[in-house]
Amino acid sequence: MKGDLGTFTADLSRWQAKLPGQADLLVQGFSQTVFNEVQSGGKYSPGTPIASGFARANWDGGVGAIPSNPPTITAEAAEANPAAGRAAAAEAGRRTATAILTAKAGDRIYLSNTARYIRRLEFGWSTQAPGGFIRLALNSAQAIADEVGAFLVKRGLRGAQ
């Protein structure tokens, strides 16, 4: 697909064995953590660089199909009012979280961004993330899966009661 910045999988099977009946929760937690790393940053990625908030506001998530929601703010509006751009980015995060909560084990989950310059940001256009942010999160997928699985086990989520 044109513009595809990566496809990845992580092995969740060992955690599924430790979390019987909780495979959906494991997939949801993993997917949300990857999204958070890409959009806002965290342990593995600095997140999408933010000036006006437009690039962060353009993230969208979907389950089973590439999402096609239109951006909630234009580049011009975000540049004129960065606070509105950041608010739109927060809304994009909430919209994606809502989509991820519908995911089931085995579903394909998509993250997309329609900002014209997202690829340039990923490949060093911004001094905020010169080493990228998408690839850093994707390259850490297994570590993220292991952290989410360990967190759920620690919380005592051993299966449906």
Where are the language model's segments positioned?
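Globin-like tetrapyrrole-binding proteins
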Residues: 124
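Protruding loop/beta-arch "assembly-hinge" segments enriched in small, turn-prone residues
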Residues: 127-161
